[in-house]
């Protein structure tokens, strides 16, 4: 492994928790803090409540967003989102998420929307749920052939911002240490993220549980 890819952490910080920081946490929290720069008192919608989306939810909580709307089709994932700080839950299998978000925001849409699923439909929904002069951030990495259709006039007249965020637009050597301090001060939730641990011989069971949406995050230990 290249030296540039290694971050030195405090020797007493549990490796199980450190493993969570290196992808989902830094990507989700970073998209909120570094990329969108969500302001205190804002309204936020997060489409997709997997490992990255859950951390976008808690990133929004950490910066003081007042209304945090979590969108998913899996009830268990929505429950995890509530634990991370979501104030409202929308099951997209039962309701139109755009209409639900507009209803929750007095018809305006949210100040910031985050898409963490990597689907054309949900990227377009997140953009549509963003208010005038709001910001929509795509966090999920799609297939190379995925295309998104956005009405150009709407982008101009509504002055919306559509942007991407890779790895939370982060500086890992700085941000991972900051995240450790945030956890130690009680601001960043990690214990609540780690739903289960598995021995290496049960790795297929771990993947199956992840695909079914039964876990927020899980670790395979060797």
Residue ranges and their predicted role:
Residues 2, 117, 140-143, 166-168, ...:
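Short strand-turn motif at the edge of the Rossmann-like AdoMet-binding core
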Residues 4-5, 10-95, 99:
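Mid-domain Rossmann-like dinucleotide-binding core that forms the NAD(H)/NADP(H) cofactor-binding site
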Residues 6, 25, 98, 110, ...:
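A general structural signal for well-ordered alpha-helical segments in protein cores
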Residues 7, 45, 69, 135-137, ...:
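Structural detector of well-ordered beta-strand residues that form the stable sheet scaffold
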Residues 9, 28, 60, 81, ...:
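Residue-level signal for nonpolar/aromatic packing positions in well-ordered secondary structure
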Residues 36-40, 73-75, 79-161:
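Glycine-rich cofactor phosphate-binding loops and adjacent beta1-alpha1 units
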Residues 124-128, 169, 173-222:
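C-terminal hydrophobic helical "lid"/dimerization subdomain
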Residues 155, 162-163, 178-183:
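Rossmann-like dinucleotide-binding domain for NAD(H)/NADP(H)
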């Amino acid at each position: 492994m290249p030296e540039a890819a290694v971050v030195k952490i405090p020797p007493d910080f549990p490796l199980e928790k450190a493993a969570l920081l290196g992808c989902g946490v830094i990507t989700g929290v970073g998209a909120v803090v570094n990329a969108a720069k969500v302001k205190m008192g804002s309204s936020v919608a997060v489409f997709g409540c997997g490992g990255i989306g859950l951390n976008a939810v808690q990133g929004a909580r950490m910066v003081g967003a007042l209304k945090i709307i979590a969108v998913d089709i899996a009830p268990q994932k929505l429950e995890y989102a509530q634990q991370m700080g979501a104030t409202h839950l929308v099951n997209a299998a039962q309701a139109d998420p755009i209409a639900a978000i507009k209803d929750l925001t007095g018809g305006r849409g949210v100040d910031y929307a985050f898409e963490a699923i990597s689907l054309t439909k949900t990227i377009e929904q997140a953009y549509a749920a963003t208010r005038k002069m709001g910001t929509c951030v795509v966090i999920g990495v799609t297939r190379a052939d995925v295309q998104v259709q956005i009405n150009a006039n709407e982008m101009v007249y509504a002055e919306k911002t559509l942007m991407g965020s890779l790895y939370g637009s982060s500086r890992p050597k700085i941000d991972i240490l900051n995240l450790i301090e945030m956890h130690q001060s009680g601001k960043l939730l990690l214990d609540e993220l780690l739903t289960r641990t598995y021995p290496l011989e049960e790795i297929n069971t771990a993947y199956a549980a992840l695909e079914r949406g039964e876990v927020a995050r899980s670790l395979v230990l060797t």
